[in-house]
Amino acid sequence: MIQQPTTAKPRISTSSKLNTVLSKNKENVPGKLFKKFKCPSLVISEKRKELPLRKKPRVNYSEYGSVDGKYDSAYVSENVSGLATIKEANRLILNHERRDPSTVIKKQFSVPKPIKGHEDISKLCAHRPPPTLGMKRKVDFIPRPLYDPADEFAIVLYDPTTDADEIIPDIKEVLAEKRKKDELLKNRKGKKEISDSEPESDHDSCVSTDTVASCSTEQSLITSNTSKHRRPNKSLKDLLGIQKEKPPPPPVAVVIDPKLARILRPHQIEGVKFLYKCVTGRIDRCANGCIMADEMGLGKTLQCIALLWTLLKQSPQAGKPTIEKAIITCPSSLVKNWANELVKWLGKDAITPFILDGKSSKQELIMALQQWASVHGRQVTRPVLIASYETLRSYVEHLNNAEIGMLLCDEGHRLKNSDSLTFTALDKLNVQRRVILSGTPIQNDLSEYFSLLNFANPGLLGSRQEFRKNYEIPILKGRDADGTEKDKENGDAKLAELAKIVNRFIIRRTNDILSKYLPVKYEHVVFCNLSEFQLSLYKHFITSPEINKILRGTGSQPLKAIGLLKKICNHPDLLNLTEDLEGCEALFPPGFIPRELRGRDRNIDSSLSGKMLVLERMLYQIKQETDDKIVLISNYTSTLDLFEQLCRARGYKALRLDGTMNVNKRQRLVDTFNDPEKDAFVFLLSSKAGGCGINLIGANRLILFDPDWNPAADQQALARVWRDGQKKDCFVYRFIATGTIEEKIFQRQSHKQSLSSCVVDEAQDVERHFSLDNLRQLFQLNDHTVCETHETYKCKRCRDGKQFIRAPAMLYGDTSTWNHFTNPTLDRIEDHLLKREAGKQQVSTVFQYKSH
């Protein structure tokens, strides 16, 4: 072919180009113009050539979709020949075949092997679970308890392996069941009133059941007919085989925090286990309350803190607490003490309590309470609310809608009156778990005991009228010394029946347990004779026309007369003699000036009172011969004024705590007195203001100067020094004016304690010493006796005023079992202060109790 020269290049068609190529390579053209297409490769640049070779072989995926099947094996780059075999290359080929979804879901994910040189990273991340990728199921962790129940010193409150039958119920479910039952009863009563045909029976329930069943059958037929015309579509969970409702996780053990387990004593461990069983409903599904009635000094506070901490942190469901919030209510003097106890036993940063101490304004307090009541879950930063009974009663309306996990009532005998405002207000709180702390659940009568039980577990003993009819009246008749033998048998039967019901929800231990952990305690009831001046004033008053009116039943102020007699027994300076006792001027001793006429001369004359003279001698001997400290307690602040004058006149440094002191300052005052480096010698304490819950272990001697009508108040006051932390032997003295109204009060206390020991302590051998008729003789003076109380005992160990047989076994609540010493035999008593009173006129008789 000859090309003609032209000025313009002619346009050549595509077909002509193809013919030209074929003509040049005619010898290489096959029979068919069909050859597998191969993508042209890009030109490798110089920079590309300088890069290092690939570490992993290249894989050819071209066999997918091939026809001739010549490319079944993987393509391996020549540059890495020898580094990977055909078998290894084939393993890298991806499989695009369709797989069964169930197989994909069930297949376990395997973590890729670590890169060479980075094995340490895999070791660091070994504790982490593999990442969730694609269709992998969620990792199900094995439920585990918060603390190891298999530890050597572990204290297990709930063990799923042994307590599996005792399933802890959910309070919400129990309440729902109660509501359903109540609604069912209401519906049945309504049907009965409307129908008025047949009495209520099982037939009514059967009819209602059949009606409901027929309605449900018709509804199911309608649903089935309509469902025939619908496509039976399945949900994604059904298609993937995912369960709609997972089975509940297995329960885990509940274990006391090891830091608390190390310090709990055996009786305290028993107490915590009892409390946990009660509040979790393992004793009775419908009763979640209980009473901790241990005597003072056994560690009720620590036991309740262990319970509270366990409920806030653990439950049989792993990772979930039993409760979110709790309230601690107590006397105002103990609010700060409870906060300190939480820090003492749990640690500084373990828990942050919400303390209502009166420092905030009313509006700020209301806002804080509303916020505390509304938060839930992780928003709860202050789970424990601590408030006094009065404060909680005032602001209870702002907590009515709050879900409170537990209510803990310290010194719970404040709830002894079910008609009081405090009882009514606290009973409105939305809380089922109620724990009452009271070392003296029976203070005056069984009605108060019923109030405490009814608050802890409402409805357990029926209504108050039912309790009084079924239990209180028969038991009191059986305890009366004038009762018949039949009354005693009936009372014992009712007492056993009541104890069977109540003992499931009350735990009571006596101070005898403390003998293992505390020093010896000597407790004495010291009967002191009146001075000549006191005796004349006492006789003058009980023979006055005012007392005669009271004895005839026409007097209008018997309580005032009782108060005047008690003040005469303490010291004449407590009275305004010219006004309170008309015509007593002739009885004044030579040189005596009444208190209201002395002016600034306020020095006290101890010789005018038998009890005050004994007190002055004791203080002097303690100060001169020992380094002990002493606590002086009285029911009257005016008596504390006399103590203060006496200490000031003798140069004794004294601290005073009464109802006038700010609550925030009380704990600082107690800490100052307990500090051994401080030089305070006497602590003056009002039993009304600080007789409950205050620890005065800095002193090892205590004098209760006058008795209270309520034996619980005296028992609380007497327990201030013999407590945990005490290092010295303790000496406790109770002063009683011989033959006076104070001895009548003491006898009445003995009767109440005898009743308490029968109901609470289950003591069967407490003798019926007193008749109720004898206890009404309050305005009589027996000035010819050394101890009227001892005469009522008919003690077989004493003859002619002397004890020939020492007490074989002393019961703390029964002074008839104590050692008895009259004044001539005081030289044989262990106490060196009382031993020196032998031969003197002031002390007539002493009852002695020794702890161990």
Curated annotation (Swiss-Prot):
Amino acids binding ATP: 294-301
Motif DEGH box: chain residues: 410-413
GO cellular component, as recorded: mitotic spindle; nucleus; site of double-strand break
A biological process from GO: double-strand break repair via synthesis-dependent strand annealing
Highest rank taxon of the organism: Eukaryota
Keyword vocabulary terms for this entry: ATP-binding, DNA damage, DNA repair, DNA-binding, Helicase, Hydrolase, Metal-binding, Nucleotide-binding, Nucleus, Phosphoprotein, Zinc
Chief localisation class: nucleus
A molecular function GO annotation: DNA binding
PROSITE patterns associated with the record: HELICASE_ATP_BIND_1, HELICASE_CTER
Keyword GTP-binding applies: no
EC class of the enzyme, as a word: hydrolase
Subcellular location: Nucleus
The protein's Enzyme Commission number: 3.6.4.12
Region (Disordered): 187-208
InterPro entries in the record: Helicase_ATP-bd, Helicase_C-like, P-loop_NTPase, Rad54_N, SNF2-like_sf, SNF2/RAD54-like_C, SNF2_N, SNF2_RAD54_helicase_repair
Residue ranges constituting the Helicase C-terminal domain according to the UniProt record: 614-767
Subunit text: Homohexamer. Interacts with rhp51.
Known function: Plays an essential role in homologous recombination (HR) which is a major pathway for repairing DNA double-strand breaks (DSBs), single-stranded DNA (ssDNA) gaps, and stalled or collapsed replication forks. Acts as a molecular motor during the homology search and guides RAD51 ssDNA along a donor dsDNA thereby changing the homology search from the diffusion-based mechanism to a motor-guided mechanism. Plays also an essential role in RAD51-mediated synaptic complex formation which consists of three strands encased in a protein filament formed once homology is recognized.
Full protein name: DNA repair protein rhp54
Species this chain originates from: Schizosaccharomyces pombe (strain 972 / ATCC 24843) (Fission yeast)
